[in-house]
Amino acid sequence: MLFSWFKIIIGWKSKSNKANLFEELVGLEWDSKAFMYGRVVNKHARYNLCFDGSSQEPDYPNGRGRIIAWDSVPLLKKIKKSLSKFINGANDLAGEGNYYYDVNKTGISFHGDYERFKVIGVRLGNSMPLYYQWFLNSEPVGTKLKIDLDGGDLYIMSEKTVGKDWKTKSIYTLRHAAGCEKYTKD
């Protein structure tokens, strides 16, 4: 049985540090395209980037997005290193960033992340709520939960909270959504 938990560390990054980290990240070239539906498409809901040991330029027709080397983002690398004090294996983690470039237009609908067991996130920039909803047989069950995240907040999502099992329709699954109302409404 999987248990769901969500941990928030309010104001984990100080005001000056989060501003510097935001500047480091916003200055990167984010993926605004992806290979989906058998073709390259423009991404309107949000932009993404991956972070790992070495850089990779995007090759969208072959399904590969941009990867930024940890050494190219020293402030983000420092966060990853500091997490290793609390989380086993954090030094071996790859990273993914979501860039909600316009909080009035961007977001992601209720979903689970079947490809990962845990999410560790730092909210930067404007405040943005994260929503959770239980589902059974692809239908929402119960009351939607809203968690407000402010710039500098660190959050950790367990395997159940990430929604790793979201494709299993016959059990209760937890899904999450973020962004503007278009993506988070019932």
Where are the model-predicted features located?
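Non-heme Fe(II) oxygenase metal-center motifs and adjacent flexible, charged/small-residue loops
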Residues: 1-186
